[in-house]
Amino acid sequence: MTRVISGEPQHGDLAPADRALRPQTLAEFVGQEQAKGNLRVFIEAAKGRGEALDHVLLFGPPGLGKTTLAQIVARELGVNFRATSGPVLNKPGDLAAILTNLEANDVLFIDEIHRLSSNVEEILYPAMEDHVLDLVIGEGPSARSIRIDLAPFTLVAATTRAGMLATPLRDRFGIPIRLEFYTPAELRHVLQHAARKMGAPLTDDGADEIAKRARGTPRVAGRLLRRVRDFATADGADRIDRKAAAMALARLEVDESGLDSLDRRYLRAMIENYGGGPVGVETIAYAIAEARDAVEDVIEPYLMQQGFIQRTPRGRMACGKAYLHLGLTPPAAPPGQAQGALFDEG
């Protein structure tokens, strides 16, 4: 599912020009003030003691800077950075090869750690806790177990689905950090910084217009800025002001609340096909022809955070804000429910 407002990484996000926009230090990293403040303390303490930083779990919606923060942690510590991801670690040997090549206090970054297979996860436990690797060599009666000592290291893991982590794995992270959606003011700062590096003629009100439609996500803000710049160049505009940004975003079908055609299709299906809910995630995913994981990880987090939908024990329900956004009249509150509950943004 490729959407200009998706927080998931896309091919264009990996271009050298885009990587050059990423902050290199905690001081340059905009937003996530509490997370940055705590990380700064933990990093300085580890450096002062000459020890490896405790293991870090970064979790939250996609596009908020988990990978960038992991790289910054290694840079601030002054150690090597090695990156991999859960889906590519198919066998214990894959992870063992990485762990045995780490130097003292290095940072190992595992993205999408919730997708780590159970047999790989099991050898990670003693590695994280005791800095040892327990491997079984051979099969059957001739199989034998060997133990390999590892250099102390820091595992920085990222996930959009912390609830899927096994409790023993989750409990081994001494520094759990949740990343939150950005405010429009923070995104404006991100956009202005990116525009300067790109040489894009972005005005303050143009930055505000993009920021309010960027779904609280820096990755989305950067992608929208690049697309808006493309339209401005094609139209011969000498600057990207509010009017130019709004026109470009309208052509991209991104509305003033940051919703695109898929978001609106999701809300419309819930309201028109299922009376506003409650409806199960499998049902709504089938109705809009999208995978359940995409619905849960990409579509729903922002809709819930903005109060368009809510989860209940019986399924998803549309809030009053969703009806109004689509130009529809919200239904009356059912007997025994206060009218205000219909507009509950939980």
Curated annotation (Swiss-Prot):
Region of interest (Small ATPAse domain (RuvB-S)), ranges: 183-253
UniProt keyword Cytoplasm, yes or no: yes
Compartments where located: Cytoplasm
One Pfam match: RuvB_N
Residues covered by region (Large ATPase domain (RuvB-L)): 1-182
Residues the record lists as binding ATP: L21, R22, G63, K66, T67, T68, R172, Y182, R219
Residues where Mg(2+) binds: T67
Gene3D superfamilies: 1.10.8.60, P-loop containing nucleotide triphosphate hydrolases, Winged helix-like DNA-binding domain superfamily/Winged helix DNA-binding domain
SUPFAM superfamilies: P-loop containing nucleoside triphosphate hydrolases, Winged helix' DNA-binding domain
One BP term from GO: DNA recombination
Membrane-spanning intervals of the chain: none
Catalytic activity: ATP + H2O = ADP + phosphate + H(+)
InterPro entries: AAA+_ATPase, AAA_lid_4, DNA_helicase_Holl-junc_RuvB, P-loop_NTPase, RuvB-like_N, RuvB_C, WH-like_DNA-bd_sf, WH_DNA-bd_sf
Enzyme class (EC, first level): hydrolase
Keyword annotations of the record: ATP-binding, Cytoplasm, DNA damage, DNA recombination, DNA repair, DNA-binding, Hydrolase, Nucleotide-binding
Residues annotated for DNA binding in this entry: R292, R311, R316
GO molecular function: ATP binding; ATP hydrolysis activity; four-way junction DNA binding; four-way junction helicase activity
EC number in record: 3.6.4.-
Region (Head domain (RuvB-H)): 256-346
Physiological role: The RuvA-RuvB-RuvC complex processes Holliday junction (HJ) DNA during genetic recombination and DNA repair, while the RuvA-RuvB complex plays an important role in the rescue of blocked DNA replication forks via replication fork reversal (RFR). RuvA specifically binds to HJ cruciform DNA, conferring on it an open structure. The RuvB hexamer acts as an ATP-dependent pump, pulling dsDNA into and through the RuvAB complex. RuvB forms 2 homohexamers on either side of HJ DNA bound by 1 or 2 RuvA tetramers; 4 subunits per hexamer contact DNA at a time.
Subunit composition and interactions: Homohexamer. Forms an RuvA(8)-RuvB(12)-Holliday junction (HJ) complex. HJ DNA is sandwiched between 2 RuvA tetramers; dsDNA enters through RuvA and exits via RuvB. An RuvB hexamer assembles on each DNA strand where it exits the tetramer. Each RuvB hexamer is contacted by two RuvA subunits (via domain III) on 2 adjacent RuvB subunits; this complex drives branch migration. In the full resolvosome a probable DNA-RuvA(4)-RuvB(12)-RuvC(2) complex forms which resolves the HJ.
Record text about domains: Has 3 domains, the large (RuvB-L) and small ATPase (RuvB-S) domains and the C-terminal head (RuvB-H) domain. The head domain binds DNA, while the ATPase domains jointly bind ATP, ADP or are empty depending on the state of the subunit in the translocation cycle. During a single DNA translocation step the structure of each domain remains the same, but their relative positions change.
Family classification: Belongs to the RuvB family.
HAMAP family found in the cross-reference section: DNA_HJ_migration_RuvB (MF_00016)
The protein, known as: Holliday junction branch migration complex subunit RuvB
Annotated source species: Caulobacter vibrioides (strain ATCC 19089 / CIP 103742 / CB 15) (Caulobacter crescentus)
